[in-house]
Amino acid sequence: HESKFQENLLDLVKSADIETIWIGNNSSCKHVCDRVKTIDYVDKDSKDYIGYGVLDEVVIEGLKKVLNKKKSNKTLIVLHTMGSHGPAYFNRYPDEFEKFKPSCKSNEPQSCSLDELNNSFDNTIVYTDYIISKAIDVLKKEKESQNFLIYASDHGESLGENGVYLHAAPMRIAPKEQIHVPML
C-alpha cells in the first residue's frame, strides 16, 4: 500500500502539533494510521483488541476514553467504524435498530430480495445515525474546547443495481453507487 510510504492527512495534522488519534472498529487502517496513536478494537495484535464483528458503539467508549486523557485542546480523533459494510448488513446493528422489515439475514446479498437487502442496509443507516448522535452528545459535554464532527464514508455500496453487489470495483468501472460518497 502506498500509504505505508507516503504522508497522508493524519501525518500532516500530527506535524502541525495537533494530537492525532485513530479509533478503529473496522479492518486495518491500511497503513494510514501507522504513525499516529491508535486504539484498534479489531486488530488481534492491539492491546485494545475485542474481536471482529463488534458493534460500532465501542468507538463511542473509545472516544470518551481519549477525551478524558487527551493532552491538548488541539486534537484530531478519527472514528473508523464498520458502518454499512456488507455483505452481512444484518450484523452491523443490534436488533432494536431493525426498523425496516423484512430484512436480509444472509452473508450472500444476492440470495435476498432487493427489498430485504435495502431494508437491511437502511437499518445500518439508522444505527450509524445513532452512533453519530452519540458522538455529538459526547463532544457537547466537552466544555473546555471547541469541537466539531465531520462524517464521511470511505466508499458507497451497490445493493443489486444491475446485478452488482457490495463495493471495491475498480474505479474505471465502478458504478456510481460505489463512488458517490456523502459527507455530513
Predicted regions mapped to residue ranges:
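Catalytic domains that recognize anionic headgroups
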Residues: 1-184
